[in-house]
Amino acid sequence: QDSATEEFSKPSPANKVAAAAKMFEVAWGPGLSAFSHALERIFHGPRPTALALRGLKISACLACALELDVAALSLVNALASFTTLDGPFKVMLPRNAACVEALLGLTAVPDCAENLGSAWLPVLRVASRVAHLRLLATGARTDDAYFTSTHAPDEKEYADRKLRDEESARALAAHSVLTDASLDELYARSTKLSAVGVERFVAELCAVSAAELSTGDPSSGTQYFLDESDLRPGGKYDDLQPLPALGDPRRPRVAALQRLVDVADMNVHLRPRLAWDRMWRVLAAHFARAGAHANADVATYAVDSLRQLSLKFLAKEELKAFTFQRAFLKPFERAFRANQGSLDRAPVRAYIVACLDVLVQARASKIRSGWKSILGVLKDASGDPDRAVSQAAFEALGRVLDHHLALVAPD
């Protein structure tokens, strides 16, 4: 044996994992073909289907545990495709419902969830579709109904109405698959992920949210991934130029955006500040984009979500020499500047000013580096061409000077 073979043959945990990974790299492709073939055969009985589904799920978990990203993404995408939810309308059979349970069940396996990486995207897209279909099945208003623009009906609207009628049948099948509590648990498990794991989870949830905001459908193919440059000083996150409005404003959804609020709320005081800062840079870039949505109601909703999170974040005092508050409040600056230049966007700008005024009144004693972001927005708003916006800004500045000047300039 040569030295390399001898080194590899030494019994150690690392070598065992490496050997398992090599074997799995050879086996997962043929295994995927066999399991997929079994699931595609409509006339197979329940037992072959159950065995194929179990094999596909175990294979996906193994790929994640061995950190084989390509294999994990391929296996998870296969599971997602067999749900029939992540794509155009198809009839949902019992085997498809079982695939939904198996796919979302991957998130309950710690080693699997931690290493899902880019495979979170198909999982979260299917979770979003299940939640939407559950609402349709119960007859409740879906979130897109609250943000639909009023306009004369056109051919596309009639096509959309027909599609919704077709989806009603699929909604009844999806309703029995998972409960609302099990969907909530999927997002609650983000608290158990590592700093790296939760950052990737949040980035993929942002991708789902961006697709929903663009078309109302998380499986539309629209993807929003942050480049590494977004997470560095001087990257897109720190660039305060106006942002392009997101997609078609006619029928956006905000379900994933609300889930982002929930995930941020669950993690804000759980994570060390440095880990939270990395996670927030991903969230902040997306919230700033949502705050520039072409649909003013959606933009206002995104700003209000930021207000809720800011009230909770600012409840904890900032240590000296840190600037976490400034980074946290920066999306308000980006959203305000992105909404400048149009009188039609004045209500959104006015709401941003009102939100910052609320933050000052409620959390002034806790604010440190955040003053820079707050005063920056109020300064821009004081010169706004819309009188209501400029007047609200001057009134907010007046309250800061009258009651909180010692906090703004303690020296």
Which positions does each model-derived feature cover?
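Alpha-helical repeat/alpha-solenoid scaffolds of the HEAT/ARM/MIF4G superfamily
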Residues: 1, 15, 107-247
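Short, charge- and proline-biased low-complexity linear segments
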Residues: 175, 202, 296, 391-394
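Extended amphipathic secondary-structure runs
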Residues: 18-58, 185-224, 228-229, 247-276
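Short, intrinsically disordered, charge-balanced linker/junction segments flanking boundaries
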Residues: 381, 392-393, 405-411
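Core helices of alpha-solenoid repeat scaffolds
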Residues: 12-35, 68-76, 113-124, 179, ...
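Helix-loop junctions that connect tandem helical modules in alpha-solenoid scaffolds
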Residues: 34-46, 59-65, 81-92, 106, ...
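HEAT-repeat alpha-solenoid elements in large eukaryotic scaffold proteins
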Residues: 1-15, 30-35, 47-60, 75-82, ...
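Extended heptad-repeat coiled-coil alpha-helical scaffolds of eukaryotic proteins
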Residues: 32, 299, 361, 368, ...
